[in-house]
Amino acid sequence: MDSITKDQHAKMENDFFSSKHEWTWDEKLSTSSIKLSDNNLNVTFHPVYSTGTAVVKGNKSLEKGRHHYWEISMITHIYGTDVMVGVGTANAELHNASERFCALLGQDRESWGFSYKGYLQHDGKTCKYGTTFGQDDLVGIHLDTWTGTLQFFINRKPLGVAFTKLNNIILYPLISSTMAQCVMKLTYSCSISVSLQTTCLTVLSPWQKAYLSKKFPGLRYLIQNIFADILQKSIDYDNEENNVEFPAQYIILDDFDYALVGFGIKKKK
């Protein structure tokens, strides 16, 4: 495997340190039922009283070939017919429920939703998914545009893959609420390129991350990035057999390791 040049490494590092907010909520959709504030990061649904269902869309589509992660803080107590997070296409209907109370995201084939009541919805079909969420919870959403999977997190704990076969579909982040004076804050909206390097992150154990961070300071931008946790597969690392650390002189970097470390390390013969 060819080594990674310093210019390529710098580009990847800049990629990982891109803006904490690559997108915000679309102010063009602001109506009397939706109030945006704090540079369009905060949303207040139905500021006075509610007469139906309101929805907000991200101001940018989610680019293909990337891992996308965004996180929404539930500021207020949640109640009522439904409060949902999810994604939708440009054809997703955003205004047809302004005078009726409903679970809007996932009512048709153009959107996919996760309800605060703990169920998923798409194409009008619902199924039980995970725990409920409410005030002070952080709801995370991870879209892998390469594999076409969408999964949700609550307080950084993964709930498992929710939807599949989302490849080659241009999607936008969506949130909806029927609740009066419901406040949400977009705390993260970031992405990284899908690559062998990011794939390596999915199988690194905590002690391996700590070791690489110590031995290869240039990798800290990668290992200490939020995606190092988001992409982590569910593997039992409590078993001591998995935590054996070999002396450095016996370590040989194979192509898998070399892809992660990049330039500057050569294999021992």
Question: What do these predicted ranges mean?
Answer:
Residues 1-269:
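PRY/SPRY (B30.2) beta-sandwich protein-interaction domains
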